[in-house]
Amino acid sequence: MSYHDERSRRSWQNAEEILGRTGFGPGDIMIDVGCGEGFFALPAARIAGSSGRVVGIDINGDAVSRMLGRAGKEGLSNVEGIVGAGEETRVCTGCADLIFFGIDLHDFADPRKVLGNARLMVKAGGTLCDLDWQKRPTPFGPPISIRFDEQTAAALIRDAGFSIERIEEVPPWFYLILAVPDPRAPPGKHPEVQSGKNLSEAEFMQ
C-alpha cells in the first residue's frame, strides 16, 4: 500500500472528518498547500458550496490537472488549481478562512517560507491546519528522519506569526495542529516571505 495512492488512502484517512475538526464551513475559502490530486481540496469544495472557494497549490502539474478534472466531472466550479512551489506562491493577501497542509509540511524545501506565505494569505480570524505524520514507525509513510514531531512543527508555525490553539492526535498515525494568526506578529514582518499575487479577498472572489 502506498501513502501516495489516493484510493487506498481513503481506507486510513477520512478527509471529511479531518476538515470537520477545522471548523471549515459553507461559504469559506480554503487554500490547500500541497494539494496533490485533491484528496482534501475536493471534499472541502463540496463543504464550501457555490459561495465558497478552494484553491489547491502543488508543484506537480499533473496532480493539479487530475484534481481539476475530477472537480469538473463533479460539477465543482469553486475549485482552482495553481502549479507552483509553496515557497514561491501566494495567491492573495488576507483572503483565506483556512490554510491547510495535508501530511506535507515536512516535504517542503523551506517550510519557513511556506508558513510565511500562509501567514500573509490567512484572514485575521482564519485558521491554519497542519495535519502530519507522527514521528514514529508506521506501516508506511515518509522516512521518520524527515518527519516533524508535534513540538518542532508547532515551533515553526509559531515562528511564522501564529498562535497554537490546540494539538490533537488523529488515529492511526497522525497529529493535527490548529493555529490562528497572532496579532502581535502581523503579516509582512517575516523576511522569509516571498513575493506573489497581492489580491484582496474581494478581488480574489471575483
Where do the model's predicted regions map?
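A short glycine-rich, Lys/Arg-flanked "PGG" loop and its adjoining helix->strand segment in the class I
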Residues: 112-124
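Core SAM-dependent methyltransferase catalytic element
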Residues: 169-206
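Class I SAM-dependent methyltransferase SAM/SAH-binding core
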Residues: 31, 37-88
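A short acidic, Gly/Pro-enriched loop at the edge of an enzyme's catalytic core
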Residues: 87-98
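Conserved beta-strand signature within the Rossmann-like core of class I S-adenosyl-L-methionine
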Residues: 125-132
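A short SAM/SAH-binding and catalytic strip from SAM-dependent methyltransferases
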Residues: 97-110
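Short alpha-helix
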Residues: 146-160
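Conserved alpha-helix/loop element of class I SAM-dependent methyltransferases that forms part
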Residues: 9-29
